[in-house]
Amino acid sequence: MDLASHPDSAAYGHLQPRSPLVRRLLAKNPSPFTFTGTGTFVVGTPGSALAVIDPGPDDPAHIRALTDALAGETVSHIVITHTHMDHSPAAVALKAATGALVVGCAPLVLRDDGPRADAGFDPSYAPDSVLADGESIHGPGWTLTAVHTPGHTSNHLCFALPQEEALFTGDHVMGWSTTVVAPPDGDMADYMASLQKLLDRDDAVYHPTHGEPVTEPQRFVRHLLAHRRQRENQVIRAIGEGLTTIPAMVAAMYAQVDKRLHPAAARSVLAHLIDLERRGLVARADDVWSIA
């Protein structure tokens, strides 16, 4: 798809309504990983205190469009789902412009044996308050409740808006593609458990940071779970057929996928392999994998 000609491209720089309490401003950062761009959400009614979810990349044009759109408004909270470079860096400029509190996920932490963060994490992220699973912030006519959904990243949060039975899903559920799970910070077992956690909820609509709203959430999540189980089975089958390295598996499993996405696919295959190894189903010697 030519992202420049996608209907969403007309939305760049304009704050557009999604529901009575939700508006979206699309950043002009389309790519094979962000689809048409990062969707920055504004929650609340004009003239009252607002929350901004995922302010987006450190892009002057997007930040200017956001601050212009919110001129004369009161922003009480800047809410972060996770600390990737297309989601959180604009929080610094938006906080400086509005004085709002930065809240949401915890900063990524270092392990004893090295960084958990991947190359795309935001080192500038410094929240005023970290929200744990089930904790909420409030504004006039709205509540946002944190739902811890590790997997894409260890610190990923979704945010429920109970007034509209809506869930802001960040990158845990995207409206156009499956989510990349990239070790060491991404974890496939956590991702699958977090999808199952969403199945136990009764949200009516998802607002992903990338892509369009998901209006049949339960069906969509079941599809994502089935897709990942299918990929897991493909990994096991590939090893059984003698494809014992990740490059060989990716070439076979993702032959019909844009090759620009193959490095990300390799990270997700690695996440599957690590999960299978922990479960005692596969083993590795250096970069070669075998059935255990």
Give the label of every model feature segment.
Residues 48-52, 57-59, 116-126, 143-232:
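Metallo-beta-lactamase
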Residues 237-292:
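C-terminal regulatory/interaction regions
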Residues 21, 66, 210, 235, ...:
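Residue-level signal for inorganic ion chemistry
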